[in-house]
């Protein structure tokens, strides 16, 4: 992505939301924002550095990935004398930012690369002024007396955020320059600003999705290459021999994770947006399964068997018996649910694909039926997306499609409306259809639901007329884990990720449901789980899918079987 990260644009958006949130008596004052970036992380009780990932709010306002940096933002309300060397927002406020980065420490340069110089940062960052981090305290305490009546805003001083240095807060208190810093408004203002993405941000998310889409395809192709060359038979390579990338096979969840991450890294992505979920067979029924430590189930095994078992520590089971003699083991029919996405310049992707493993690289009849139903849920949801549509309505439609699909498969029985009202579908589809995505994979939680309001009762960012659909009141379990509860607005970026799961934990409370044909259900439980997830941006007239990897059954099977 070319060009300088538009930090001033993001500061202006945040300041506009901040002034909207403030009580009337505070809006006439100058507002001062103090933020600190992430510090260099270390492994516990050692001097070994860990990978740095900048705190999202700090990066949003600075575009700075340098550890131990700080930010001072001053905003003067409309109608007041503008600040020197400042930017004027669309509402008439003047804003000025100073980015502080650490000096080079000659003693540290032997061990680690030095931070950029001020001259280098001036060419690559969108701040009004630059200074060194060791000047942060003096700059803050010298600036405030010049501003008159001012309110200082900081993020909550909790472990969730890098805290502003205590020396700054102490010096402010000693000097008696202002009332104590306020933590009420800055985070909601940031979340509201981040909810609607700029074209620059959307391009970063598009690139993250392109890289992750190719990595998902790599997984399918490696599985297919293995299926074509050795027919899914047990690997006989020696554990102590080097294996080149072109010889890699995927027989374990960890191997799939390794190939996915390697594919992203070789394309320049530094971080995964979240811990990959690599779940085979029944493990796919656990929504956030991040263990990724099991081998795939092995046979020989008939596709109709429901007792796919994997020893967690020993890996493969190589004792298949057929026709009274030892038979060469092959991969058992199962699915691999891979929910993984990388970041590009700290902006996330979030993609899930469910791929057949074993069975010649093709879905069993039961897995295919469930996959096609989930795909129908997702396609209908995507087709409905447009500004003004309430996200609750998308969630409800997914449940309706599931109910009708289960009736056709014979898993459900009875009247569709009665089944929907019973909320039994929540046992199979317990989570929300999607969430906001941006600098964080579960982005801006405080702005994704309608609770945060201004002092006058106006909903953040989206106006006063947002209401929850009446239908939502009648199906509370459908929305319990829905992370977005708003009408859609152009510029929102969100995931669409319905799924169907056969989790013993979730099914236990509905085992006696009169709406379930338990004999039919038993035939599908070995599927484990299926989820399909894409990232979309809401446009003026609909949506654009930023995820490019295929998801049609025929396309996936062609890759996973080695046909192409």
Which residues does each PLM region occupy?
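Active-site neighborhoods and metal-handling regions in enzymes and metal-associated proteins
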Residues: 1-564
């Amino acid at each position: 992505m070319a060009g300088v990260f538009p930090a001033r644009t993001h500061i202006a958006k945040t300041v506009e939301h901040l002034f909207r949130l403030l009580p009337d008596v505070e809006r006439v004052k100058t507002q001062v924002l103090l933020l600190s970036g992430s510090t260099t992380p270390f492994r516990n009780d050692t001097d070994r550095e860990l990978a740095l990932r900048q705190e999202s709010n700090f990066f949003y306002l600075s575009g700075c990935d340098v550890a131990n940096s700080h930010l001072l933002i001053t905003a003067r309300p409309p109608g007041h004398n503008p600040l020197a060397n400042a930017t004027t927002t669309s509402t008439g406020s003047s804003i000025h930012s100073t980015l502080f980065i650490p000096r080079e420490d000659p003693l540290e340069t032997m061990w680690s690369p030095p931070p950029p110089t001020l001259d280098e940062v001036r060419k690559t960052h969108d701040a009004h002024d630059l200074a060194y981090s060791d000047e942060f305290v003096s700059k803050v305490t010298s600036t405030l007396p010049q501003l008159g009546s001012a309110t200082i805003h900081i993020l909550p001083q909790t472990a969730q955020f890098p805290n502003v240095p205590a020396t700054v807060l102490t010096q402010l208190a000693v000097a008696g320059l202002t009332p104590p810093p306020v933590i009420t408004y800055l985070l909601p203002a940031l979340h509201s600003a981040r909810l609607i993405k700029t074209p620059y941000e959307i391009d970063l998310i598009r690139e993250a999705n392109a890289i992750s889409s190719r990595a998902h395809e790599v997984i399918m192709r490696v599985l297919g290459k293995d299926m074509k060359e050795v027919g899914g038979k047990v690997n006989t390579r020696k554990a102590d021999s080097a294996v080149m990338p072109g010889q890699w096979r995927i027989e374990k969840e960890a191997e799939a994770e390794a190939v996915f991450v390697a594919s992203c890294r070789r394309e320049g992505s530094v971080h995964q947006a979240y811990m990959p979920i690599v779940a085979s067979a029944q493990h796919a029924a656990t929504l956030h399964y991040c263990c990724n430590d099991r081998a795939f189930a092995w046979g020989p095994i008939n596709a109709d068997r429901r007792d796919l078992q994997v020893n967690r520590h020993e890996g493969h089971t190589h004792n298949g018996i057929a026709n009274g003699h030892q038979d060469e083991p092959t991969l058992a029919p199962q699915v691999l649910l891979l929910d993984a996405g990388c970041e590009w310049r700290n902006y996330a992707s979030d993609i899930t694909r469910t791929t057949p493993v074993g069975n010649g690289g093709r879905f069993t009849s039961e897995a295919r039926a469930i996959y096609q139903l989930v795909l129908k849920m997702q396609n209908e949801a995507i087709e409905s997306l447009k500004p003004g549509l309430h996200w609750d309505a998308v969630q409800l439609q997914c449940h309706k499609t599931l109910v009708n699909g289960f009736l056709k498969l014979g898993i459900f029985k009875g009247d569709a409306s009665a089944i929907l009202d019973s909320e039994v579908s929540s046992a199979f589809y317990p989570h929300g259809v999607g969430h906001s995505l941006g600098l964080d994979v579960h982005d801006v939680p405080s702005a994704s639901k309608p609770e945060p309001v201004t002092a006058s009762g106006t909903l953040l960012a989206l106006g006063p007329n947002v209401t929850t659909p009446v239908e939502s009141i009648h199906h509370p379990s459908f929305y319990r884990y829905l992370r977005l509860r708003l009408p859609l607005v152009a510029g929102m970026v969100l995931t669409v990720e319905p799924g169907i799961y056969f989790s013993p934990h979730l099914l236990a409370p509905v085992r006696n449901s009169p709406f379930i044909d338990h004999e039919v259900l038993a035939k599908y439980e070995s599927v484990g789980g299926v989820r399909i997830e894409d990232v979309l941006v809401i446009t003026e007239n609909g949506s654009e899918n930023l995820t490019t990897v295929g998801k049609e059954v025929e396309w996936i099977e062609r890759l996973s079987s080695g046909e192409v």
